């Protein structure tokens, strides 16, 4: 990930956060992300030049203690308006055509932006109010402190939680197939899961998290937007990552 110069407001904002939100999750020393439109465009350009070619092969891969891999990490900037889907897609397709980018990378990235992201937005406007009240599995458990500090004893889960705390970001497979999957298997109330995701990620927004949590991640909506629950055990996680087998495999 490319580095960005600190804003002249950085220290002032840090003091404000420490004084008012010191008990909130996160790490103020690891602001890897740009804070303006120019920086967001530079990050998109860097993705296209450095990681786009291999995105299609590795978009679902996980690597212990490694976060960004071949992902663009532009969702925070799309969600607050530094970038627009239209501009991202036009620039992406122009770059792909000029540089002969593999089709699986082009299709995978474009689908995430105008397929998944815009689909989620539509679902939220049509079904979001119903989804946010749904609890198909009747789950009722609460999240304990171990879900917030990464001490659950399940190695991949703890790694993903600690990475989230460090970066305020993690890509879609750890979110879906590790964190929310295990929360759901543990019978955690979907409203608790929604709250956790809203608290922990810099790209969180109600319209993003309601369909993704109540629909995709937990099937709490009973199938409003998907045909089956996304559930897996340790075998899938081992196949998609470099996590080592351990006692956690007997649990998951």
Summary of predicted features, one role per range:
Residues 1-70:
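Specificity-determining recognition surfaces
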């Amino acid at each position: 990930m490319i580095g960005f110069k600190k804003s002249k407001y950085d220290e002032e904002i840090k003091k404000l956060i420490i004084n008012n939100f010191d008990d909130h999750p996160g790490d103020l020393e690891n602001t890897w992300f740009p804070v303006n439109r120019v920086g967001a465009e530079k990050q998109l350009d860097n993705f296209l030049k450095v990681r786009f070619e291999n995105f299609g092969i590795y978009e679902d891969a996980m690597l212990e203690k490694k976060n960004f891999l071949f992902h663009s990490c532009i969702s925070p900037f799309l969600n607050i308006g530094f970038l627009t889907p239209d501009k991202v897609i036009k620039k992406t397709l122009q770059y792909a055509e000029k540089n002969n980018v593999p089709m699986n990378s082009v299709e995978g990235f474009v689908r995430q932006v105008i397929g998944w992201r815009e689909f989620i937005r539509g679902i939220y406007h049509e079904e979001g109010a119903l989804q946010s009240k749904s609890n198909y599995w009747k789950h009722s458990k609460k999240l304990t402190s171990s879900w917030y500090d990464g001490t659950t004893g399940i190695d991949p889960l703890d790694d993903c939680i600690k990475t989230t705390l460090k970066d305020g970001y993690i890509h879609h497979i750890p979110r879906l197939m590790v964190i929310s999957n295990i929360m759901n298997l543990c019978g955690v109330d979907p409203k608790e899961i929604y709250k956790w995701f809203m608290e922990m990620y810099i790209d969180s927004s109600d319209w993003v998290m309601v369909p993704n949590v109540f629909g995709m991640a937990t099937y709490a909506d009973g199938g409003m937007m998907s045909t089956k629950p996304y559930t897996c055990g340790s075998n899938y996680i081992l196949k998609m990552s470099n996590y080592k087998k351990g006692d956690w495999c007997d649990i998951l």
